[in-house]
Amino acid sequence: MSVTNVSNETNATKAVFDPPMGITAPPIDELLDKVTSKYALVIFAAKRARQINSYYQQADEGVFEFIGPLVTPQPGEKPLSIALREINVGLLDHEEG
């Protein structure tokens, strides 16, 4: 009878994650300097994200009613992240009302 040495050791691999995007990049504190309140930021970013999303949908149809992203989008970046970056860079002006 032969016994084979079997090692129960496992090689733990280190998880690799992409850096977080969205509300963590750009930082929320920088974004809040651009608007009057966190609620205004939510509404402002959501409206712009809807415009960007509509632009992408209409681009497939050849209709350009909305303005596309004002910053260069990263591959796979969501419209809300694009909108937050536009706000942070100062490409959009927020008006209460």
From Swiss-Prot:
Keyword list (alphabetical) reads:
DNA-directed RNA polymerase, Nucleotidyltransferase, Transcription, Transferase
**Reactions performed catalytically:** RNA(n) + a ribonucleoside 5'-triphosphate = RNA(n+1) + diphosphate
| Enzyme category, top tier | transferase
Q: Which domain of life is it from?
A: Bacteria
Q: EC number(s) for this protein?
A: 2.7.7.6
Molecular-function annotations in GO: DNA binding; DNA-directed RNA polymerase activity
For this chain's UniProt record, which GO biological process terms are given? DNA-templated transcription
**InterPro entries in the record:** DNA-dir_RNA_pol_omega (IPR003716), Pol_omega/Rpo6/RPB6 (IPR006110), RPB6/omega-like_sf (IPR036161)
Keyword Protein biosynthesis tagged? no
A GO cellular component term found in this entry reads: DNA-directed RNA polymerase complex
The family classification in the record reads: Belongs to the RNA polymerase subunit omega family.
Task: Describe its function.
Answer: Promotes RNA polymerase assembly. Latches the N- and C-terminal regions of the beta' subunit thereby facilitating its interaction with the beta and alpha subunits.
Quaternary structure annotation from Swiss-Prot or TrEMBL: The RNAP catalytic core consists of 2 alpha, 1 beta, 1 beta' and 1 omega subunit. When a sigma factor is associated with the core the holoenzyme is formed, which can initiate transcription.
Cited PANTHER family: DNA-DIRECTED RNA POLYMERASE SUBUNIT OMEGA (PTHR34476:SF1)
- What is this protein's record name? DNA-directed RNA polymerase subunit omega
Protein species of origin = Corynebacterium efficiens (strain DSM 44549 / YS-314 / AJ 12310 / JCM 11189 / NBRC 100395)
